[in-house]
């Protein structure tokens, strides 16, 4: 059995001039249309969109919950394995002889800023409190909500979201992007990390779809994080200052506060 040579180039057609110069027009326009359609749907039919999205999320949570936890644990094992296995642990991202662009302090600052960011402001205490009243152990009947026997479960589920499992997920994606881009010389896209599986098939529609889905997932993920963070920030400022324009009669942040 022969091992194929690694793919060191990926021909992704990009625009040579105009507004989309240097970008794949198919991916850029496709992502804009998809996100724009989703936003338009949410604005024009908020109740229907909310019900459909909640139903989709509930279905995903109920059908893939155990799988999600196993995958997160697998990510941690893979990260530790890559670190301690000599063949991979000694690989220098960027190629032999390259040096880091930033100091260790700067790298750690960027990692925590991007990996935790605004969530650290309130979720450090807010999430354990939330899980103290409701978490999968409570739902399955293994713990009683808001009781002493639920403290351990509340912290367990908080650490699942913010501990090694979360960083393992971030590291897998980050390593894939960094290795295939800076060590293999491929474009800095999600599709590049899939070249060992699909090869040059990623130069066409398959690769475009992968990148479009990645863009949509990134935008939606960041939007949810910013939305929750800004909402909680506005609530905190209201509780401290009492400025009425920050909250409406239902106790939710006003549109002006969110903007």
What label would you give each PLM region?
Residues 89-91, 123, 127, 153, ...:
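Flexible, active-site-adjacent loop/turn segments at secondary-structure boundaries
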Residues 52-62, 144-170, 211-215:
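Membrane-core helix-loop-helix motifs of multi-pass transport proteins
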Residues 2-147:
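N-terminal alpha-helical transmembrane segments of multi-pass membrane transport
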Residues 51, 228, 232-235:
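Transmembrane-helix terminus/interface motifs of multi-pass secondary transporters
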Residues 7-15, 56, 147-154, 166-167, ...:
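Short, mixed-charge, low-aromatic patches
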Residues 131-150, 232-255:
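Hydrophobic alpha-helical transmembrane segments and immediately flanking/interface helices
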Residues 19-26, 30-43, 76-79, 116-120, ...:
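Helix-loop-helix module between adjacent transmembrane segments
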Residues 84-92, 186-194, 237:
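Membrane-embedded alpha-helical segments and adjacent helix-loop junctions characteristic
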């Amino acid at each position: 059995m022969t091992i194929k040579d690694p793919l060191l180039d990926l021909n992704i057609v990009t625009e040579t001039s105009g507004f989309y110069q240097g970008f794949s027009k198919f991916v850029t326009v496709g992502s804009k249309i998809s996100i724009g359609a989703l936003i338009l749907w949410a604005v024009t039919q908020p109740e229907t969109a909310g019900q459909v999205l909640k139903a989709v999320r509930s279905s995903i949570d109920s059908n893939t919950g155990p799988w999600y936890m196993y995958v997160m644990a697998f990510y941690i094992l893979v990260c530790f394995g890559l670190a301690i296995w000599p063949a991979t642990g000694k690989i220098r991202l960027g190629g032999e002889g390259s040096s880091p662009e930033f100091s260790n302090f700067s790298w750690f600052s960027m990692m925590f800023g991007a990996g935790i960011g605004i969530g650290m402001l309130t979720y450090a205490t807010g999430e354990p409190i939330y899980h103290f009243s409701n978490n999968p152990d409570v739902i399955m009947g293994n713990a009683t909500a808001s009781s002493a026997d639920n403290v351990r479960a509340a912290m367990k589920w908080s650490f699942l979201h913010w501990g090694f499992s979360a960083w393992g997920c971030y590291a897998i994606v980050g390593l894939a992007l960094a290795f295939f881009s800076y060590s293999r010389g491929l474009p800095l896209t999600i599709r590049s990390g899939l070249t060992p599986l699909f090869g040059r098939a990623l130069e066409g529609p398959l690769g475009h779809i992968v990148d479009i889905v990645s863009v949509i997932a990134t935008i939606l993920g960041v939007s949810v994080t910013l939305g929750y963070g800004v909402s909680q920030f506005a609530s905190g400022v209201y509780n401290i200052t009492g400025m009425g324009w920050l909250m409406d009669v239902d106790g939710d942040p006003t549109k002006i506060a969110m903007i």
